[in-house]
Amino acid sequence: MAGSPLLCGPRAGGVGILVLLLLGLLRLPPTLSARPVKEPRSLSAASAPLVETSTPLRLRRAVPRGEAAGAVQELARALAHLLEAERQERARAEAQEAEDQQARVLAQLLRAWGSPRASDPPLAPDDDPDAPAAQLARALLRARLDPAALAAQLVPAPAAAPRPRPPVYDDGPTGPDVEDAGDETPDVDPELLRYLLGRILTGSSEPEAAPAPRRLRRSVDQDLGPEVPPENVLGALLRVKRLENPSPQAPARRLLPP
């Protein structure tokens, strides 16, 4: 009790008052500790009043003793409660101090581990060797060495889903050599070949620089004029049919958006 904060700290006044009250209640009242004064008896005085006064005096002695015992028990319980609260507070402060000491030691070890060695190459001016250790030390101090919080801090972020690649657009070869080029390159859209073949067979002299529109899908019979002989139409259809089945060695490239 000599080094107890209850006697030295801000609670010293309350504990001192409780101790004084306890000592005051344990001390007997002066009416009970004083000796009764014997009164001179006369021969004519009867002894009956002595018997009557002896009973209230005995009751007066029993009542203060019971009240003092109850007050002493209450004070003892209050003092035990204060001592238990002081013990819990001291244990909590010691545990907090131990955690802080462990966090400081771990931060120093991480800082020493992250410091550059003599065998390491020189760092750039923008590199900070103390940054990883400082960040991890701050995370440990915030988590208070909690394994769950530390695991949540160290779990890597999930990788982002791969973005789809945009479709490849190619104008393809133009001019009178489209048929020969189509036989050698199987990665050509059949719809575009059908459109270009129809334009060539009709003898149109318009420039073919721009690709065919997406929604312009006409059959070969509509593009062909009435002056084209039937055998040429049959040959064109057979060539388009052969182009629609490319070889499986090279994957077909998409020229138009789906």
From Swiss-Prot:
Region of interest (C-terminal inhibitory domain), ranges: 219-258
Compositional bias (Acidic residues): 177-188
GO cellular component: extracellular space; secretory granule; trans-Golgi network
GO biological process, one term: neuropeptide signaling pathway
Biased composition annotated in UniProt, kind: Low complexity: 204-213
Pfam family, one: ProSAAS
Keywords: Cleavage on pair of basic residues, Golgi apparatus, Neuropeptide, Secreted, Signal
Reported function: May function in the control of the neuroendocrine secretory pathway. Proposed be a specific endogenous inhibitor of PCSK1. ProSAAS and Big PEN-LEN, both containing the C-terminal inhibitory domain, but not the processed peptides reduce PCSK1 activity in the endoplasmic reticulum and Golgi. It reduces the activity of the 87 kDa form but not the autocatalytically derived 66 kDa form of PCSK1. Subsequent processing of proSAAS may eliminate the inhibition. Slows down convertase-mediated processing of proopiomelanocortin and proenkephalin.
Protein name: ProSAAS
Organism: Mus musculus
